[in-house]
Every structure is written in C-alpha cells, then in structure tokens.
Design a protein with these regions (language model features):
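Acidic catalytic/metal-coordinating carboxylates
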Residues: 35-38, 62-65, 89
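Active-site residues of response regulator receiver
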Residues: 55, 82
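Non-catalytic signal-transmission and effector/linker regions of two-component phosphorelay proteins
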Residues: 1-7
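Receiver (REC) domain active-site loop signature in two-component systems and cognate sites
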Residues: 58
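Short acidic/polar segment at the start of the alpha1 helix of CheY-like receiver
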Residues: 12-16
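Charged docking surfaces used in two-component/phosphorelay signaling
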Residues: 17-25
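Conserved phosphotransfer cores of two-component systems
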Residues: 44-47, 69-76
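Acidic, metal-coordinating helix/loop segments flanking the phosphotransfer/catalytic sites
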Residues: 32-51
C-alpha cells in the first residue's frame, strides 16, 4: 500500500523540516514547496496529494491565494499555519472556504 502524500508549504526551511520530519516518522510521503507559486505548480503536477500544510505568510503568493487557486479545482484538506495572532485576519480570510 502506498503512503499518503502530504505537501508542506513554508518559506522557512526550518519549519518545513520540522513538519516534514514529523510526517515522515508517521509514514507519510512529503512533498515540499518554499513559496506559494511553487506550491500551486507542484500541487497540479503531482497526483494524489491527500493533505496540504500551508503557511499563510509567504513571498510571491501567500497561503490564502494558494488556497483560492487550489479550491478552484480541488477539495483537498488544507491546514493553514500562521504566526498572525489577530483574529480579524483569520475571520476575514476564512470567507474563501
């Protein structure tokens, strides 16, 4: 049986490594992207991604934009990570779902 594929997207390599190491230990295959544009490209190039772990604040294309692009074609589960603490930011952006 093939392992489930998880895409981890974060512009900080330490954060990607932390999440990747945890997921690999749990038996997942991990695909990495370091910015939003790369994430969208990799998502549509790769078959069968089961979950996306997505940073909100990134260069080129932020996590909310990535989510909007992917939602046009897929309902893959997405976990959003953020260092933002302002509840207004969270509530404003959740309308994309």
């Amino acid at each position: 049986m093939d392992n489930l594929k998880v895409m981890v997207v974060d512009d900080e390599s330490r954060m990607r490594k932390l999440v990747k190491d945890f997921l690999v230990k749990k038996g997942f295959d991990v695909i990495e992207a370091e910015n939003g544009e790369e994430a969208v490209d990799r998502f549509f190039e790769t078959k069968d991604i089961a979950l996306i772990v997505l940073d909100v604040m990134m260069p080129k294309m932020d996590g909310w934009e990535v989510c909007r692009e992917i939602r046009k074609m897929s309902q893959v589960p997405i976990i959003m990570l953020t260092a933002k603490s302002d509840e207004k930011d969270e509530l404003f952006e959740t309308k994309i779902f």
